[in-house]
C-alpha cells in the first residue's frame, strides 16, 4: 500500500473541480476544438460477445492458434479499435473457460482508441477478451475532454475503467502547449471515480519542476471527491500577507466539510476555518467554526484581555419533520466586537452592528401554528454593550376562514426580555390580538374591512437604576388595550395600448386605506424591541409605524396611492411606477418622550413614497425609489440604479443610495450612537462594471464615492485571464473598515488578492466575473 501524503502540489492541481461553475460557452467551444471526439456509433452493453473484425493487406497463420497480419492492420470489436503495421494474434484454450483467450501483439505505428482514450506508440499488446491493453513508449489523449500525456508504458484495465501510466505525465493543456504538467512514477486514472492517483509526483511549469509530492490525487471530472481546493493568496493592510489552503472532505453522501488553514502574517498564526454541511431527516444545515489560537496584534491592542484567541461560530439550520415540526437555527457569535473589523467573513460584517443567535421550534397543522424561540444579540460596540434578548418567546396563531363571510385569526405572544447589563429593565410581555376580516372582491377590485383588538400586559422588573435617572418612571405592571379598525380598497383597470404600442397592456391600480388606532400613553413601558419601519411604497399601507410591540402609534389616517404597470405582448412587465402618501387627521403618538417628532403636533400629508421600474429593453433597466418624511424634515431614503446587461459577464451599472442621519437615528438609535461614520447619514454614488476587454481577458470594477465626506467609500478592481488550461486572477479592494475615535476619521483596509486555477479538469470555463462581483464589499444586485 503506497503512502498517501497530500502536499501543496495537490492544491495547485485540484483547482478546477471546485471552482465556480459559470460557463463561458465560446471559450469552452474553442477548447473542445483541440480535443478528439468519438465519431463511430457507440455500442452499448457487454461488447465481449461481439465478433472481432480484422482487416490487413496480408495474413498468414497456424489456425486456430496463431495468425500474423501485416500491412495497414485494423482490428475492431465493439467500441475498441487497434491499428498497427503488424499484428500477431494468439488464441489458446484456458482451463475452465468456455471461450479461448485471445491476445494480440502489435508492432509499428500502434494506435489504440475507444470512446474513452487514444493510445499511440511503437509497440502494443491487447487482450481481446478483457480489453486489457498495453502500449509502450507512447502518448495518450482523452476522448471528448481535455487530458493528455506520455508514458514509458500505458495500460488499459478493468473494462477500460482504469488507465495506468508507468513513468508518465498528465496535462489538460491542448496539444502544442505544455504550460503545466504533472509527472509521476505511476499514474492511475479511474474513470468511474473521476480521479487520478499519482505517485512521486512532480508539478512542472513548462519544463521546470516546481513542487514534489510522494502522492497526490487529481480530480478529473465533476464528481464530489475529497481533495485540496483552490489555493488563495492576498495582501491586506489589516493582516499583511494571507494564504488560504482549503481542503474539501467528502464525508458521506449527505455531509461534507471544507477545512481551510488560513495563514496571516501580521497575526503571527494560522486560523483554522472549518465549514461543515449536512442533510438529515431533521433538515439541512451549515456550521462554521473559525479558530485563531493566538493573535499578537490583538494582544498588543488589548493588553488587559486575558486571552488573544479569536474565534467565530456560525450555525444555520432549517428543517421539517413529520410535516408538522419545524426546526430553525440562525446563530452567529464571535470572540470579540472587533472580529469582523479584523477578518473578512461571509457570515457577518462590522457594518451589521450586531450578530444574532436564534433558535426556534415550531409546530403547524391546519389552521394552527406555534413557535417557541430564543433570540440573543451580540453588539459590536465596546461603548454600548446593552442589548435585549428574548429568553424565551412563544408565538401562537389560530386561523379560521370562511366563518360566514368573515375570516378570523387570533395571534398570541408571550416573551421574557433580558438585558446584557445587570442594571437595565427587564420584562415579561404577554400579547393577545384577535382579528376579524370581511374580504370582498371581484375581477376588477377588492375591499377588505378589518377590526382587531391589541391587548398587552407587561410585568417589568429591575427598574431602580432607570427610574432614578429619568423623569418618566416605568411601571412594574402595565396594561395596554387598543382597538384597531382598517378599511383597505383596491381597483385594477387595464387598457390595450394599440395606438402607442401594439400588443402592450397598461394597468391603473388605485388604492386607498383608512386606519384608526386610538392613542394610549406608553411612556411607562420601556422600549425592548421596537424601531421605526422603513416607509417605501408598500410600507405606506402597513398597520404599524414601528416594528415590535412596545410602541404602537395612534393612527387616524388615510393612505392613498396609485400604481401603473405596462406589460408587453408576452406578459412581461416592462414598466411600473407607484406613488403614495399618508394623510394624518391627528398626530400619530405613543407618549414616548424619546421620539422627538411627537412634540411637533404635525398633521396633514407627512409621509410620501414612490417606486419605479423600467425595463427599457432586454439589456437596459432602470429602478428607483424615494421616501419623504416631513417629521424628519427631509428625504428619509432614496435609491436609484440604471444598468446595461448583455449577459452574465458583460454589464455596467450606475447607482445612488441615500439615507438621512435623522432616518438612521430613528431606525437604528443604538447603532447610530456608536457608528460615527454614519453621523452625517449616507450619500453614496457608485458604479459597477464587468466586461471581457480582450481575447480571454475580463475585468470587474466597483467604485463608491461618499458625497457627504467628499472621499472614496469603497472600491474594487479584478482582472482575470482565462485559457484552456489555466486562469489567473488578480484583484484589489479598498473598503471601509470602522472608525478611529482617537483620530476621528474612517479606517480603510486595502487588499490585493491573487489566485490560479488549472482548467480542463472539469466543465468550468467561466471568466470569473460573477465570483468577483459577489466578493465585493458592496455586492452587485441585479436591476433587470
From Swiss-Prot:
Disulfide bonds join 31-724, 173-725. One of its GO terms (cellular component) is transporter complex. Residues 1-24 form the signal peptide. GO terms for biological process: Gram-negative-bacterium-type cell outer membrane assembly; lipopolysaccharide transport. It is found in: Cell outer membrane. Keywords: Cell outer membrane, Disulfide bond, Membrane, Signal. Coiled coil: none annotated. Contains two intramolecular disulfide bonds. InterPro entries: LipoPS_assembly_LptD, LptD, LptD_C, OstA-like_N. Component of the lipopolysaccharide transport and assembly complex. Interacts with LptE and LptA. Belongs to the LptD family. Together with LptE, is involved in the assembly of lipopolysaccharide (LPS) at the surface of the outer membrane. This is LPS-assembly protein LptD. It comes from Escherichia coli O6:K15:H31 (strain 536 / UPEC). The lineage of its organism: Bacteria, Pseudomonadati, Pseudomonadota, Gammaproteobacteria, Enterobacterales. The gene is lptD.
